[in-house]
Amino acid sequence: MLLPYAHCHLASHKFPAEEIDALLLRAKENNIHRMVTLATSLEDIPHNIALTEQHDNVFSALGIHPCDVHQTPENFLSQLRDYAQHPKCVAIGETGLDYFHPAPDGWTDEAYHLRQRDYLRQHFQLAAELGKNIVIHTRDPTGKQSLDDAVAIYSEFSDKVTAVFHCFLGPRENAKAILDLGGYLSYTGIATFKKATDTLDAAVHTPDDRIMVETDSPY
């Protein structure tokens, strides 16, 4: 079986440039025939685009990670729009909501999360405009507030945009909320852990044509 690899960060400094060819060869030897490398900041985008131009089987998703919104200018969308029209950009992202990490210095949690939601909505607007999919990150210290908020925003655009919720951990009712909107779920190896019963249960009940695989490498 040939597998598409839904989510990695080949432009990360943890991958020395001279090792990329060998990495892609190992992936091919393990039946991974396509990869999507994701940008997480404006500065990160050119390197990701370059990788797609150098390798036929590498594609990109371009966006601003929620933990980077505080240092991303409010007019970011015009730059992102230009980049995202590259022919090998297949999605907008990685975007989303991260309530796990504390607000940076000078920001309250309320202001930080408000900007994340604003930027997520702008990413959705761009995806709708360009006819591209979107890749969503959510993370909470406890509970599922970020996922609930992201799903609520997705519901505003689900007739125009298909979302992939990456590194999905479950439980099944969260999966259903996303699947009901037409979204996809991307699972990591966590689904194989003995204690990750919610993740495994969600994966087992995700339709075959709505499931994706990843490692979020190198993280």
Predicted regions and their residues:
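Mid-domain alpha/beta scaffold segments of enzyme catalytic cores
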Residues: 1-219
